[in-house]
Design a protein with these regions (language model features):
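Conserved donor-nucleotide/metal-binding helix-loop-beta segment in metal-dependent transferases, i.e.
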Residues: 88-115
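Glycine-rich hexapeptide-repeat left-handed beta-helix
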Residues: 279-422
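Solenoid scaffold repeats with emphasis on beta-solenoid/beta-helix
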Residues: 2, 216-217, 222, 228, ...
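Extended, small-residue-rich solenoid/repeat segments and analogous flexible loops
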Residues: 163-166, 177-262
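Catalytic-core segments of class I nucleotidyltransferases/pyrophosphorylases
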Residues: 77, 94, 98, 126-210
Length: 422
């Protein structure tokens, strides 16, 4: 699980909900979910209770909720584990539920790209229609449903009444509306970000830093050289070391037992995990770095580097196109505009970039991939693959350079003077 400020995203969500008085959680897990279960256990470390259900196949949100039907109370919140928002939204939805005796409360906000969302119509305070991803040009409203719901247990009956599909969840809510049940909505204008693409993590990281690191936080056991410079709102965890001539310009986060080496620069919303070494003269700018990563004489800008990665000396991330246009990536065969002209590399777990390798803006590789020394990586590299330059034989020749006796004498005298000067 990738961490932001030392915690998995789902933990930030659980802690936010706990602050608003929610203590009982059901987490639906699927493939790879054991990692979540091992991390949280029964939730007692967080002061909550967590139960788990398993969704054996990825059959959509309605199916996921059906696995938890036996554990559901009469009314309950439904929250995506990878959505981040302000706690005020939960309070507003709870208040709406109490004041209007609603069966379901949806959260919504105005959007421009309406064809990407479920769009609702609201009349006299009640939701009268929900259309999932209306055709572009055919939409007549712009209020989009976002991923926080206050649901009635009666919704499970509606899941069973509509066919299984990608839109089963939304179709069931629409059926619930058509049957004249009371569905209300809260219009929300606060921060909201969903994790769909890797670069979505940058907005989340910025939000968390701005709201969590409001003043410098230097934990016990941190060693900061007198020759180092630490400025702004930084959070440095226990056991970390900031060596001579290093510069840390907040807002930044530096994990436990991480070393920021000599002459390094860490700046601009950089987040570095636990047990990392940012070696001599490296620069890390607005990047998200996992645990146990090693760097040496690197530039890492606007990049996402997962756990256990290693960058050899001189490996560099490019993060800006010469034409200054947005970075566009190919995702599942489709071109996707990232919405930013600053994006570096996206690197999966346990991957390596060899000495003097160059990583083009937005390039992706890993997990378990290797970019060889000197490679200029312009395209994505699949997981578990290696890429190297063609092996070319080195040419060995006589240098054809000889010194006369007089030249040798002059060189010897110069070397003697140099030695005496030292």
């Amino acid at each position: 699980m990738f961490k932001l400020l030392g915690k998995p995203l789902i933990q930030h969500v659980i802690e936010l909900l706990k602050e608003k008085g929610l203590e009982n959680f059901v987490v639906v897990i699927g493939h790879g979910g054991e990692q979540i279960k091992e991390h949280f256990g029964d939730g007692s470390d967080l002061g909550v209770h967590i139960a788990y259900t398993i969704q054996k196949e990825a059959l959509g949100m309605a199916n996921a909720l059906e696995t938890a039907e036996a554990l559901a109370e009469d009314h309950f919140f439904v929250v995506n584990a990878d959505d981040l928002f302000e706690g005020s939204l939960i309070a507003e939805m709870a208040a709406k539920f109490k004041e209007g005796n609603a069966d379901i409360v949806l959260s919504c906000k105005p959007v421009e790209e309406t064809w990407k969302f479920g769009i609702i119509t609201v009349k006299n305070g009640r939701v009268t229609n929900l259309v999932e991803k209306p055709l572009k040009g055919k939409e007549t409203r712009n209020l989009a449903v976002i991923g926080v719901y206050l649901m009635s247990k009666r919704i499970f009956d509606y899941f069973r009444r509509v066919p299984v599909s990608d839109h089963q969840y939304e179709d069931a809510i629409q059926k619930f509306i058509e049957d004249k049940n009371n569905v209300s909505a809260v219009s929300y204008d606060g921060f909201f970000a969903g994790y769909k693409y890797p670069w979505d993590l940058f907005r989340m990281n910025t939000f968390l830093m701005d709201n969590t690191i409001k003043k410098p936080r230097i934990e016990d056991g941190v060693s900061i050289s007198e020759k180092a410079k630490v400025e702004g709102n930084v959070w440095i965890r226990k056991g970390a070391k900031i060596l001579d001539n290093a510069c840390v310009n907040g807002p930044c986060y530096i994990g436990a037992n991480t070393i920021i080496g000599n002459n390094c620069l860490v700046r601009g919303y950089a987040s570095i995990g636990d047990n990392c070494i940012v070696g001599f003269t490296s620069e890390v700018k607005n990047s998200l770095i996992g645990d146990n990563c090693l760097f040496h004489m690197n530039y890492v800008g606007d990049s996402i580097i997962s756990d256990g990665c290693l960058f050899g000396a001189g490996a560099t991330t490019g993060n800006f196109r010469f034409d200054e246009k947005n970075i566009v990536l190919t995702i599942d065969g489709k071109k996707v505009d990232t919405g930013t002209n600053k994006l570096g590399a996206i690197v999966g777990d346990r991957s390596r970039a060899g000495i003097n390798s160059s990583l083009a803006p937005g390039v992706r590789f890993g997990p378990y991939s290797i970019v060889g020394a000197g490679v200029n990586l312009q395209e994505d590299l699949e997981p578990g693959k290696m890429i190297f330059l063609d092996k070319k034989s080195n040419i060995v020749k006589d240098n054809g350079f000889t010194l006369s006796a007089e030249e040798k004498q002059k060189l010897t005298e110069v070397l003697k003077k140099y030695k005496q000067a030292k």
